[in-house]
């Protein structure tokens, strides 16, 4: 993948890199990539799918952090919309399903559905947990009824939090401006990544200080902390985050 030197994170592979690899090795049968990444940066799945199919390869996408994509024009399209042959989504990460719940989506004729089911049967229990399966169906139903509104609420909440955080001196925030470079075609704004290097802390140190003060962040790395915003977050959550930042870091 490409690299963002400002935030110190890997971003996405480009369509050109995919085509170059397929040209070098005609025996490649599948392209596998992660989109979006943990920071909400999505690859150009539509173009990559077209390239993969041109060379006779299937496109498989790890979309663990994007089960909500496709429910709002404010978010990047889902990989299945863009022509991927299969994608795996962690329904429990962002949506309302219970922990451990995920979905595998398959479309088109490039993959054998029966073989996929046979392979899955080797890896899954013959006594599945019906509570987990019921929560998957409940999450699916919730999105079918109000997915658009839920996605819009999450985006609005994240945008508000991002604007408030931008008032603190020295903080750098990842925004939709990252799209268009480093292989990034779209940005999921519900992932609020904050670079804290200017404050003299590593992301890990800042995350621990926030945790001790009662604010749990989704991810920490060398220079950043990431806040995951969902449709259920509201004003009280922002107030708590901002109060802790003012108390601990300013």
How would you name each of these model-derived features?
Residues 37, 198, 231-235:
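A generic structural motif
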Residues 105, 195, 228-230:
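Short hydrophobic/aromatic beta-strand micro-patches
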Residues 158-159, 176-193, 225:
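Conserved glycine-rich beta-strand-loop-beta hairpin in the small C-terminal domain of fold type I
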């Amino acid at each position: 993948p490409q690299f963002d030197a400002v935030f110190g994170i890997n971003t996405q592979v480009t369509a050109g890199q995919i085509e170059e690899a397929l040209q070098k090795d005609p025996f490649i049968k599948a392209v596998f990539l992660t989109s979006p990444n943990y920071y909400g940066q999505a690859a150009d799945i539509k173009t990559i799918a077209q390239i993969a199919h041109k060379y006779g390869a299937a496109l498989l996408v790890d979309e663990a952090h994007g089960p909500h994509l496709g429910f709002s024009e404010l978010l990047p399209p889902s990989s299945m919309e863009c022509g991927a042959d299969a994608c795996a989504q962690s329904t429990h990460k962002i949506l309302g399903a219970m922990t451990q719940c995920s979905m595998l989506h398959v479309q088109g004729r490039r993959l054998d559905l029966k073989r996929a089911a046979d392979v899955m049967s080797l890896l899954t229990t013959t006594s599945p947990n019906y509570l987990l399966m019921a929560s998957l169906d409940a999450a699916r139903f919730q999105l079918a009824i109000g997915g658009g509104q839920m996605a819009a609420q999450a985006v609005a909440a994240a945008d508000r939090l991002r604007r408030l955080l931008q008032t603190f001196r020295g903080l750098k925030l990842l925004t939709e401006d990252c799209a268009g470079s480093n292989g990034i075609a779209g940005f999921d704004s519900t992932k609020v990544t904050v670079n804290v290097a200017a404050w003299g802390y590593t992301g890990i140190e800042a995350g621990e200080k926030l945790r001790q003060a009662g604010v749990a962040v989704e991810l920490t790395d060398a220079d950043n902390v990431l806040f995951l915003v969902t449709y259920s977050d509201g004003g009280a959550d922002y107030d708590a985050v901002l109060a802790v930042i003012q108390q601990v870091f300013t």
